[in-house]
Amino acid sequence: MYQNHKNEILLATPLIKDDIVFTKSVVYLCQNDRHGAMGLIINKPLADTLKDVFEELHIPHTNTFKEILEYPLYMGGPISPHKIMILHTTNGRNYTSTIKLDEGLAITASIDILEDIANNILPEYFLPVVGYSCWTANQLTDEIKSNDWIVTNKLNKKILFNHENKVKWQNHLEHAGYTLQSLDTLFNRNTGNC
């Protein structure tokens, strides 16, 4: 039976292994309905930074805060890997291409938000991602039933937007009430250093 998980977090379980994209992934679900789901992986930083994006798009950034220039881009998923989007808290600004989500979040795919960021006009929280993840109708439901994903509706913006990516999966897991030991028990095998 279909269940809407929009605005929830997917945590890859140890059953997803040897998958370069989804192993130990934390996915924020932006959209989920009977036709499918769309989400962004939020814990897989790439080598490219916002400075690289500003230079490629010829966005002036001489006055941009250094820490903003060093923000990594995140691999949002395998679909459209060259499309940049900003997952962010709403800040009262109206951008050309914004989809408002729940919990005061939005996703914007237009250059005007990048220009604002380059000018240090920042949302409270934001995460630049390239690409996205997609599931067809019933695909995500089937993967959840197969225990590939733990779903949590315990959204915490500080954890969601935190740049400590090596522990983001575990932090979300713990925030959802799980431990590495409980995963061992749940999956009846040793997950090692998940």
From Swiss-Prot:
Highest taxon of the lineage: Bacteria
Cleavable signal peptide: none
Annotated Gene Ontology cellular component terms: cytosol
SUPFAM superfamilies: VC0467-like (SSF143456)
Entries under InterPro entries matching the protein: AlgH-like
PANTHER family reported for this sequence: UNCHARACTERIZED PROTEIN YQGE, UPF0301 PROTEIN YQGE
Protein family (similarity comment): Belongs to the UPF0301 (AlgH) family.
Protein name (database record): UPF0301 protein FTM_0963
Protein species of origin: Francisella tularensis subsp. mediasiatica (strain FSC147)
